[in-house]
Regions:
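Iron-associated oxidoreductase/ferritin-like identity signal
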Residues: 2-211
């Protein structure tokens, strides 16, 4: 992946420090030599653990809203949320496997995810309050993007191209998700018309757009 900026001295990135400080990577397996120092692998794995926790929390919230949304926007949102949580579920595996490739255990309990995630539980949302659901997903996707950028700084400093590629792909995806759901907040029935749109992951959904 082409570098577009100068290196930040290791351990000096103010952005990277935030994500890495939320997680302490567990003991590494012995004998790993993939061209990245043990200390760098530990810091990257810790950052990815936080990123995985953010991603899982957002996945669970998106799935929750897919199940429970009601009202005039049901068809649009039920289908959109399904496309997003399905894609997110697959991505969780990729993130966890990258942590394992670096030689560390991936967080895998609700307690771990709650401790490491920057996304806090929002207030309970009534199924008919679709705007509150959408606003929580805007905030959640933006939080995932911020954590991805923090860990990307750490991976860039260590020349960890696979982690950089993974995080770049996730950034593109979650920035798009944030845009898609944010756009819905500018539109509310009856001042909308339905048209066919394209959701992420190749799924089609009926999107509402302003007249």
């Amino acid at each position: 992946m082409a570098k577009t900026k100068s290196k930040t001295p290791k351990g000096k990135s103010p952005a990277g420090k935030t994500a890495a400080s939320r997680a302490k990577a567990p003991a590494t397996a012995p004998g790993i030599d993939i061209g990245i120092s043990a200390s760098d692998r530990k810091q990257i794995a810790a950052g990815l653990a936080s990123f995985l926790s953010d991603s899982f929390t957002l996945y669970l919230r998106t799935h929750n809203f897919h199940w429970n949304v009601t009202g005039p926007m049901f068809n649009t949102l039920h289908t959109m949320f399904e496309g997003q949580y399905t894609e997110q579920w697959t991505a969780l595996d990729e993130i966890a496997e990258r942590i394992r490739a670096l030689g560390f255990a991936a967080p895998a309990s609700y307690a771990d995810f709650a401790r490491l995630s920057s996304i806090q539980d929002g207030p309970a949302v009534d199924g008919g309050d679709w705007r509150a659901m959408v606003q929580q997903l805007v905030s959640g996707n933006e939080a995932v993007c911020r954590t991805a950028r923090e860990v990307l700084e750490i991976a860039d400093d260590a020349d960890d191209a696979p982690t950089e590629d993974l995080l770049t792909q996730r950034l593109q995806t979650h920035e798009k998700y944030a845009w898609l759901v944010r756009a819905l907040l500018a539109c509310a029935p009856p001042g909308c018309i339905a048209r066919q749109g394209q959701a992420s992951g190749g799924r089609h959904y009926t999107g509402d757009v302003p007249l």
